Protein backbone atom coordinates (compact mmCIF):
# COMPACT_ATOMS: atom_id res chain seq x y z
CA UNK A 1 0.00 0.00 0.00
CA UNK A 2 2.93 2.35 0.44
CA UNK A 3 3.10 3.84 -3.07
CA UNK A 4 -0.59 4.76 -2.66
CA UNK A 5 0.05 6.16 0.82
CA UNK A 6 2.96 8.32 -0.32
CA UNK A 7 1.00 9.53 -3.34
CA UNK A 8 -1.77 10.76 -1.04
CA UNK A 9 0.77 12.33 1.32
CA UNK A 10 2.29 14.25 -1.59
CA UNK A 11 -1.12 15.60 -2.60
CA UNK A 12 -1.41 17.86 0.48
CA UNK A 13 -0.39 21.48 -0.11
CA UNK A 14 0.14 24.46 2.20
CA UNK A 15 -0.01 27.88 0.55
CA UNK A 16 0.72 26.31 -2.82
CA UNK A 17 3.65 24.17 -1.65
CA UNK A 18 3.69 20.44 -0.80
CA UNK A 19 3.33 19.81 2.94
CA UNK A 20 6.13 17.24 2.70
CA UNK A 21 9.52 18.23 1.29
CA UNK A 22 10.94 14.69 1.34
CA UNK A 23 10.33 11.31 2.95
CA UNK A 24 13.03 11.98 5.55
CA UNK A 25 10.81 14.75 6.96
CA UNK A 26 7.84 12.43 7.59
CA UNK A 27 7.53 10.73 10.99
CA UNK A 28 5.08 7.82 11.00
CA UNK A 29 2.90 8.25 14.10
CA UNK A 30 0.50 5.32 13.94
CA UNK A 31 -1.10 2.69 11.73
CA UNK A 32 -4.69 1.43 11.88
CA UNK A 33 -6.41 -1.27 9.88
CA UNK A 34 -9.92 -2.69 10.19
CA UNK A 35 -10.85 -5.82 8.27
CA UNK A 36 -14.29 -5.74 6.67
CA UNK A 37 -14.36 -9.51 6.04
CA UNK A 38 -13.45 -12.60 8.06
CA UNK A 39 -10.01 -14.20 7.87
CA UNK A 40 -11.45 -17.11 5.86
CA UNK A 41 -13.05 -14.72 3.36
CA UNK A 42 -9.81 -12.76 3.08
CA UNK A 43 -7.84 -15.92 2.30
CA UNK A 44 -10.18 -16.66 -0.61
CA UNK A 45 -8.63 -13.65 -2.39
CA UNK A 46 -5.04 -14.91 -2.05
CA UNK A 47 -3.11 -14.26 -5.26
CA UNK A 48 -5.64 -11.76 -6.60
CA UNK A 49 -4.89 -8.18 -7.56
CA UNK A 50 -6.16 -5.80 -4.86
CA UNK A 51 -7.25 -2.28 -5.80
CA UNK A 52 -6.13 0.49 -3.45
CA UNK A 53 -7.76 3.91 -3.23
CA UNK A 54 -5.99 6.52 -1.10
CA UNK A 55 -6.72 10.10 -0.09
CA UNK A 56 -5.60 12.61 2.53
CA UNK A 57 -7.46 14.70 5.07
CA UNK A 58 -6.44 18.33 5.40
CA UNK A 59 -3.39 18.77 7.63
CA UNK A 60 -3.61 20.16 11.14
CA UNK A 61 -0.99 21.88 13.26
CA UNK A 62 0.41 20.23 16.38
CA UNK A 63 3.43 20.31 18.67
CA UNK A 64 4.73 17.26 16.77
CA UNK A 65 4.60 19.09 13.45
CA UNK A 66 1.98 19.28 10.75
CA UNK A 67 -0.04 16.08 11.03
CA UNK A 68 -1.46 14.50 7.88
CA UNK A 69 -3.95 11.62 7.95
CA UNK A 70 -4.05 9.21 5.01
CA UNK A 71 -6.93 6.81 4.30
CA UNK A 72 -6.69 3.70 2.11
CA UNK A 73 -9.39 1.26 1.04
CA UNK A 74 -8.46 -2.27 -0.06
CA UNK A 75 -10.93 -3.72 -2.58
CA UNK A 76 -10.99 -7.13 -4.29
CA UNK A 77 -11.53 -7.56 -8.02
CA UNK A 78 -15.16 -8.54 -7.45
CA UNK A 79 -15.78 -5.25 -5.63
CA UNK A 80 -15.65 -6.66 -2.09
CA UNK A 81 -14.28 -4.14 0.40
CA UNK A 82 -11.61 -6.06 2.29
CA UNK A 83 -10.16 -3.48 4.67
CA UNK A 84 -9.97 0.17 5.67
CA UNK A 85 -6.53 1.53 6.58
CA UNK A 86 -5.47 4.81 8.20
CA UNK A 87 -1.92 6.17 8.51
CA UNK A 88 -0.86 9.36 10.31
CA UNK A 89 2.35 11.28 9.74
CA UNK A 90 3.93 14.30 11.42
CA UNK A 91 6.00 16.55 9.17
CA UNK A 92 9.14 17.49 11.09
CA UNK A 93 10.39 21.06 11.27
CA UNK A 94 6.94 22.59 10.80
CA UNK A 95 5.58 22.95 14.35
CA UNK A 96 3.29 25.98 14.63
CA UNK A 97 1.15 24.83 17.57
CA UNK A 98 1.60 23.52 21.10
CA UNK A 99 -1.41 21.20 20.80
CA UNK A 100 -0.77 17.46 21.01
CA UNK A 101 -2.06 15.27 18.18
CA UNK A 102 -5.27 13.46 19.16
CA UNK A 103 -4.85 9.79 20.03
CA UNK A 104 -5.55 7.25 17.33
CA UNK A 105 -8.78 5.23 17.68
CA UNK A 106 -8.35 1.95 19.54
CA UNK A 107 -8.45 -1.50 17.88
CA UNK A 108 -8.30 -0.22 14.33
CA UNK A 109 -11.40 1.90 14.88
CA UNK A 110 -13.82 -1.02 15.04
CA UNK A 111 -17.21 -0.25 16.53
CA UNK A 112 -17.89 -2.85 19.21
CA UNK A 113 -18.91 -3.05 22.84
CA UNK A 114 -15.72 -3.81 24.78
CA UNK A 115 -15.48 -4.93 28.40
CA UNK A 116 -12.29 -4.79 30.45
CA UNK A 117 -10.93 -7.99 32.01
CA UNK A 118 -7.99 -8.77 34.31
CA UNK A 119 -4.75 -8.60 32.33
CA UNK A 120 -3.42 -12.03 31.29
CA UNK A 121 -0.20 -12.86 29.43
CA UNK A 122 -0.97 -15.16 26.49
CA UNK A 123 2.32 -15.26 24.60
CA UNK A 124 5.83 -13.87 24.78
CA UNK A 125 8.36 -14.29 21.99
CA UNK A 126 11.72 -12.84 20.98
CA UNK A 127 12.67 -11.96 17.42
CA UNK A 128 15.78 -10.52 15.79
CA UNK A 129 15.33 -7.58 13.43
CA UNK A 130 16.68 -7.94 9.87
CA UNK A 131 20.31 -7.16 9.06
CA UNK A 132 19.10 -4.89 6.24
CA UNK A 133 15.67 -3.86 4.98
CA UNK A 134 15.80 -4.25 1.18
CA UNK A 135 13.61 -7.37 1.12
CA UNK A 136 10.90 -5.71 3.23
CA UNK A 137 11.05 -2.56 1.10
CA UNK A 138 10.48 -4.64 -2.03
CA UNK A 139 7.57 -6.48 -0.40
CA UNK A 140 5.86 -3.43 1.08
CA UNK A 141 6.76 -0.80 -1.53
CA UNK A 142 8.20 1.45 1.21
CA UNK A 143 11.57 2.62 -0.11
CA UNK A 144 11.96 5.51 2.33
CA UNK A 145 15.76 6.04 2.30
CA UNK A 146 15.90 6.24 6.08
CA UNK A 147 15.29 2.47 5.99
CA UNK A 148 17.16 1.44 2.84
CA UNK A 149 20.13 3.81 2.42
CA UNK A 150 23.13 4.47 4.67
CA UNK A 151 23.49 7.91 3.08
CA UNK A 152 19.80 8.64 3.61
CA UNK A 153 20.08 7.61 7.25
CA UNK A 154 23.18 9.80 7.67
CA UNK A 155 21.24 12.83 6.42
CA UNK A 156 18.88 12.25 9.36
CA UNK A 157 21.79 11.99 11.79
CA UNK A 158 21.70 8.19 12.07
CA UNK A 159 24.65 5.81 11.93
CA UNK A 160 22.71 3.21 9.91
CA UNK A 161 19.27 2.71 8.37
CA UNK A 162 16.39 2.03 10.75
CA UNK A 163 14.14 -1.01 10.70
CA UNK A 164 10.78 -0.23 9.10
CA UNK A 165 8.17 0.41 11.78
CA UNK A 166 5.74 -1.63 9.71
CA UNK A 167 8.10 -4.62 9.83
CA UNK A 168 7.64 -4.69 13.60
CA UNK A 169 3.87 -4.25 13.22
CA UNK A 170 3.72 -7.20 10.81
CA UNK A 171 5.94 -9.29 13.07
CA UNK A 172 3.74 -8.54 16.09
CA UNK A 173 0.66 -9.50 14.08
CA UNK A 174 2.33 -12.75 13.08
CA UNK A 175 3.12 -13.49 16.73
CA UNK A 176 -0.59 -13.07 17.51
CA UNK A 177 -1.87 -15.13 14.59
CA UNK A 178 0.72 -17.93 14.51
CA UNK A 179 -0.36 -21.45 15.45
CA UNK A 180 0.87 -22.67 18.83
CA UNK A 181 1.79 -26.27 19.69
CA UNK A 182 -1.90 -27.03 20.27
CA UNK A 183 -2.93 -25.62 16.90
CA UNK A 184 -4.58 -22.52 18.39
CA UNK A 185 -4.24 -19.00 17.01
CA UNK A 186 -5.96 -15.62 17.25
CA UNK A 187 -7.75 -13.93 14.36
CA UNK A 188 -7.31 -10.14 14.16
CA UNK A 189 -10.27 -8.00 13.09
CA UNK A 190 -8.92 -4.54 14.00
CA UNK A 191 -5.39 -3.29 14.75
CA UNK A 192 -3.96 -0.02 16.07
CA UNK A 193 -0.16 0.32 16.11
CA UNK A 194 1.52 3.19 17.97
CA UNK A 195 5.26 3.82 17.64
CA UNK A 196 7.34 5.25 20.50
CA UNK A 197 10.95 4.45 19.57
CA UNK A 198 13.36 3.20 16.93
CA UNK A 199 14.46 -0.35 16.11
CA UNK A 200 18.03 -0.74 14.91
CA UNK A 201 19.19 -3.40 12.45
CA UNK A 202 19.88 -6.75 14.21
CA UNK A 203 18.14 -5.66 17.44
CA UNK A 204 16.55 -8.40 19.55
CA UNK A 205 12.93 -7.46 20.27
CA UNK A 206 10.68 -9.00 22.91
CA UNK A 207 6.98 -9.13 21.96
CA UNK A 208 4.40 -9.67 24.72
CA UNK A 209 0.76 -10.45 23.94
CA UNK A 210 -1.78 -9.88 26.71
CA UNK A 211 -5.53 -10.15 26.95
CA UNK A 212 -6.93 -6.94 28.43
CA UNK A 213 -10.63 -7.22 27.59
CA UNK A 214 -13.28 -8.93 25.56
CA UNK A 215 -15.67 -7.97 22.82
CA UNK A 216 -19.30 -8.41 23.83
CA UNK A 217 -20.71 -11.66 22.42
CA UNK A 218 -17.47 -12.68 20.68
CA UNK A 219 -13.71 -12.26 20.74
CA UNK A 220 -10.93 -10.90 22.93
CA UNK A 221 -9.17 -7.57 23.19
CA UNK A 222 -5.39 -7.87 23.07
CA UNK A 223 -2.53 -5.52 23.90
CA UNK A 224 0.76 -6.31 22.19
CA UNK A 225 3.92 -4.61 23.47
CA UNK A 226 7.29 -4.64 21.71
CA UNK A 227 10.41 -3.66 23.61
CA UNK A 228 14.18 -3.84 23.62
CA UNK A 229 15.13 -1.97 26.78
CA UNK A 230 12.07 0.25 26.69
CA UNK A 231 8.67 0.18 25.01
CA UNK A 232 9.06 0.72 21.27
CA UNK A 233 5.53 0.04 20.08
CA UNK A 234 2.15 -0.75 21.55
CA UNK A 235 -0.52 -2.49 19.52
CA UNK A 236 -4.19 -3.05 20.20
CA UNK A 237 -6.01 -5.86 18.49
CA UNK A 238 -9.53 -7.17 18.61
Model regions and ranges:
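Catalytic-pocket segment enriched in acidic/His residues
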Residues: 153-206, 210-221, 226-231
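HotDog/MaoC-like acyl-thioester-processing domains
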Residues: 29-124, 199-238
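Hot-dog-fold acyl-thioester-processing enzymes
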Residues: 1-30, 96, 100, 105-107, ...
